[in-house]
Design a protein with these regions (language model features):
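Soluble catalytic domains of enzymes that build or remodel membrane lipids, polysaccharides, and related
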Residues: 1-131
Length: 131
């Protein structure tokens, strides 16, 4: 966790797959946010869009994720959105839960195969206008 210019916290979260694949310990949201000043805007970067309930409960302001590549391929794009295949809370887009905003981008690249169908590559610009 970093406090940037006394204006906002930037909180990086260990990738969830490192916990399952390599036995790494992933800190809980309550551990990561226990020392935050609630009056300062907080941003969590979490590679995979998982753990939304704990992130919203922690009171952070914004969570940004990627990982899903927007579904990457037809029919996965639709199947992931409808069924939650892959264990993600969201495949693409934005939503708000308990005053926490969540944004999942499809990113600019692919994974393992060198193309995408049914989703766009994108750079995401987020405008934050104070707390």
């Amino acid at each position: 966790m970093l406090l940037i210019d006394n204006r906002f916290y930037l909180i990086g979260r260990q990738d969830a797959s490192e916990q399952s694949d390599f036995g790494a310990t992933r800190a809980s949201m309550s551990e990561l946010t226990k020392d935050l000043d609630d009056n300062v805007f907080s941003i969590v970067m979490d590679h995979q869009p998982r753990d939304y309930a704990a992130q919203a409960k922690s009171g952070v302001d914004l969570v940004v994720s990627g990982h899903t590549h927007g579904g990457q391929l037809i029919p996965l794009t639709t199947l992931m959105k409808l069924t939650g295949i892959g264990g993600n809370d969201r495949v693409y887009g934005a939503e708000t839960r308990e005053n926490t905003d969540f944004i999942v981008t499809s990113g600019i690249a692919d994974w393992e195969i060198f193309f995408k169908t049914g989703c766009v590559s994108e750079f995401t610009v987020i405008d934050i206008k104070g707390k």
